[in-house]
UniProtKB/Swiss-Prot annotation:
Name under which the protein is recorded: La protein homolog
Keyword vocabulary terms for this entry: Acetylation, Methylation, Nucleus, Phosphoprotein, RNA-binding
Every HTH La-type RNA-binding domain range: 23-112
The record's account of how the chain is modified after translation: Phosphorylation is not required for the roles tRNA and snRNP biogenesis.
Primary gene name: LHP1
Start-end of Basic residues biased regions: 237-254
Major localization listed first in the record, in broad terms: nucleus
Entry coiled-coil feature ranges: none
Length: 275
């Protein structure tokens, strides 16, 4: 009787937490690896990447390479020693003497970078309604590459950012596409905007897509938040009943108790859902 549990324990598969598939680091692969990390530290990403920026600020600009290696798009580059080898060839980045950390050779002017955000938004479109219901977290890196290839056929772009649901962190079917120039962005919008029925239909895997400016997307998102969390509608979508704010009761009037909304509870709840 005592042998069976022991046998089952021996047959239990080993953890794959630290396992990886070794890839051949050809010159092309080394170059892609380097460009990916340089992008993380670029003016297009670093000022807006809170995690990366705060990590660097705490360490005089340095970020552990082991941390960067955990990013989804970097997990395929193993062993990490090859990543370090690629980074040592960078003209933008500097690797520490012990090979443990990396930082920009010339720090970014974050104030100027933040001021450039307005211009960046003018070059950015939101493309919505991508198939996403069956997309697992493990499929995100491959999907990212596929969507980048999809948009590169349609215009000159800097980056494609997949939006995620703040509750489950899964891809929500919307991507933000940043074009290299405002004219490129405007040309794409003119060709595929849903405002003009004569425009060409933009689709992906047979599904019609919707195209909005970044400003339209932000306004739509704020309107959705207001609808879901305003005191007037009190819908609180996605919340269990036990998590709803409790409103203090007023004195009885005409034999009935009236409730008064606690606006601070609603504001706190809305703040919790900011991305």
């Amino acid at each position: 009787m005592s042998e069976k549990p022991q046998q089952e324990e021996q047959e239990k598969p080993q953890s794959r937490r630290n396992s990886f598939a070794v890839i051949e680091f050809t010159p092309e692969v080394l170059d892609r690896c380097l460009k990916q990390v340089e992008f993380y530290f670029s003016e297009f990403n670093f000022p807006y990447d809170r995690f990366l920026r705060t990590t660097a600020e705490k360490n005089d600009g340095w970020v552990p390479i082991s941390t960067i290696a955990t990013f989804n798009r970097m997990k395929k580059y193993r062993p990490v020693d090859k990543v370090i080898e690629a980074l040592r060839s960078s003209e933008i980045l500097e690797v520490s003497a012990d090979g443990e950390n990396v930082k920009r050779r010339v720090p970014l002017d974050l104030t100027a970078a933040r001021n450039a955000r307005i211009e960046q938004n003018q070059r950015t479109l939101a493309v919505m309604n991508f198939p996403h219901e069956d997309v697992e977290a493990s499929q995100i890196p491959e999907l990212q590459e596929n969507l980048e290839a999809f948009f590169k056929k349609l215009g000159e772009i800097n980056q494609v950012r997949l939006r995620r649901d703040h509750r489950n962190k899964k891809f929500n079917g919307t991507v933000l596409v940043e074009f290299k120039t405002i004219p490129e962005c405007e040309a794409f919008l003119k060709s595929y905007s849903n405002d003009d029925e004569s425009n060409e239909i933009l689709s992906y895997e047979g599904k019609k897509l919707s195209v909005l400016t970044k400003k339209q997307f932000d306004l739509q998102r704020e309107a959705s938040k207001s609808k879901n969390f305003s005191g007037r509608s009190r819908s609180f979508n996605g919340h269990k009943k036990k998590n709803l704010p409790k409103f203090p009761k007023n004195k009885k009037k005409n034999g009935k108790e009236e409730s008064k909304e606690d606006s601070s509870a609603i504001a706190d709840d809305d703040e919790e859902h900011k991305e």
